[in-house]
Amino acid sequence: MIKIFFFRLYFFIIILFSYSFAMAYEEPSFKIVHQTDKYEIRHYQERLAVQSTYNNQNSSFRNLFNYISGANKDSQKIKMTTPVTQYDNNSEIVMQFYLPSKYTAKTAPIPSDPRVTLINIEEGYYAVIRYSGNARDKNFDKHSQILRTSLIEDKVQIIGPSIKAIYNGPFTLPIMRRNEAMFKVEWKKL
């Protein structure tokens, strides 16, 4: 009986910790302009990110993490934000970390590593489908295809590659994870 109690207590603490840990990061602000039972259309304002192109996911994450940990011209530490995004650019993968909203192109520290670049992401409309579980390609591809099919059925024009948005770290329980598949779209009210 005591073992069951401690197991439940442990499980509850892990869930609570996972949830509160995920909620601690700044996210880019957006406005939902349309919603269906499968997806939503969001309008994002212009935002600043750092990005790295890679063939090996771990090295790119490390490059970006080093930048926010102080590997920049000002040796300035920058708070982590969510989501971390990835998209396919021909045969390479681009990974991006959004910078906190207090930074502008003029005030953001310059990366020390030439593999890391600052980028302004233009404002625009994005179709988004949310899912839990792991962020592996198989799960992302499944949800990305559901989103693509729904957008085609609704005659919403896709104008960019599929984007994987990851909101939680690897220690978050899969059932508690927030992942998204996104497409930049040409938005006209349906």
List the predicted regions and their residue ranges.
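Sec-dependent N-terminal signal peptides of Gram-positive bacterial secreted proteins and lipoproteins
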Residues: F11-F17
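A solvent-exposed interaction/effector surface
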Residues: I2-F6, F17-L190
